[in-house]
């Protein structure tokens, strides 16, 4: 049975609950070269500034414009200085939050699971609502260059493949689970495996001919498609996953409870134009809980077998 059929109903049940409640390193472990030591005390401390890390979903120029607007909104709403930093990698955002060098981070679902494994006191606060579906989920897709002779997943063997990051959910984890189900081992069966570092960069590598197929989130694919960058006579969507819980904004245990509540309300009440900071088509935020990401844990566990 396909892993996505196996967990599909679980995913939908979990996600409906969300919607209506408001390369030596092992890529599946939460370990890092950094020790990620936790603070010696979990006591609440006065907060005079909020620092937030954000994973690099799309080109930094566009994302930085959106970040500045969100910074200004949160600073005004919370009456506290808010500084948002776009990190150079997924792992950098994970490390900053785990080690509590920032109070908040915008992470992918798998990045959150990795961070939570290293710092159990972390918790998801909100996730964005997908504009096209009005639901807090999205999907992973694989886009192929048909001129390379690729029309389905089996055709990927012997071709060059692009992932986003080993900490990316839609750009690595979910696609890897599908490959495992099909007994495809990327490092063995593909001519080359590349990691672009961002979803837009992964599609740019496909267009440039650096890779023959790429795993990305469907949102970024649709943006490129709408812009005419992926003409149908050359590029084809050859696979799409079942729904994945959307990327959470995760908070540190050092934040006072009252501030956590204020942050959650601020995000949920944010104007629509301020919720697209991850390069996604979002219409708002909804509250989420740790158990909403159990599907990702199950996929991770299956891959570790």
Model-derived features with residue positions:
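A ligand-binding cleft/hinge motif common to bilobed small-molecule-binding domains
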Residues: 109-119, 178-181, 207-208, 212-232
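Acidic, polar ligand-binding/catalytic clefts
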Residues: 95-155
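Bilobed "Venus flytrap"/periplasmic-binding protein-like clamshell domains
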Residues: 47, 52-75, 87, 110, ...
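Short helices/loops that flank or line small-molecule/ion binding pockets
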Residues: 91-106, 118-119, 154-157, 198-219
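Periplasmic-binding protein-like
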Residues: 51, 55-56, 131-141, 168-170, 196, 267-283, ...
């Amino acid at each position: 049975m396909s892993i996505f059929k196996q967990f599909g109903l679980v995913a939908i049940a979990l996600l409906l609950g969300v919607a209506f409640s408001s390369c030596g390193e092992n890529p599946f472990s939460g370990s890092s070269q950094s020790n990620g030591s936790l603070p010696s005390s979990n006591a609440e401390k006065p907060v005079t500034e909020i620092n937030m890390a954000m994973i690099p979903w799309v080109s930094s120029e566009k994302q930085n414009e959106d970040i500045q607007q969100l910074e200004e909104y949160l600073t005004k709403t919370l009456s506290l200085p808010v500084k948002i930093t776009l990190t150079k990698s997924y792992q950098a955002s994970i490390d900053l939050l785990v080690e509590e060098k920032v109070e908040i981070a915008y992470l992918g679902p798998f990045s959150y699971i990795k961070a939570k494994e290293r710092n159990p006191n972390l918790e998801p606060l909100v996730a964005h609502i997908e504009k096209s579906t009005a639901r807090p989920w999205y999907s992973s897709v694989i886009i192929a260059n048909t001129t390379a002779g690729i029309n389905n997943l089996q055709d990927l063997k012997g071709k060059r493949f692009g992932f986003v990051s080993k900490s990316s959910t839609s750009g690595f984890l979910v696609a890897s689970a599908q490959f495992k189900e099909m007994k495809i081992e990327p490092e063995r069966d593909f001519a080359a495996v590349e990691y672009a570092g961002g979803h837009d960069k992964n599609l740019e590598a496909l267009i440039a001919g650096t890779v023959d197929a790429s795993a990305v989130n469907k949102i970024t694919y649709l943006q490129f498609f709408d812009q005419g960058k992926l003409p149908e006579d050359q590029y084809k969507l050859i696979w799409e996953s079942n729904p994945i819980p959307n990327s959470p904004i995760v908070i540190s245990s050092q934040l006072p409870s009252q501030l956590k509540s204020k942050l959650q309300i601020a995000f949920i009440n944010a104007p629509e134009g301020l919720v697209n900071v991850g390069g996604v088509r979002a219409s708002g935020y909804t509250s989420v809980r740790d158990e909403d990401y159990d599907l990702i844990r199950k996929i991770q566990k299956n891959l570790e077998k």
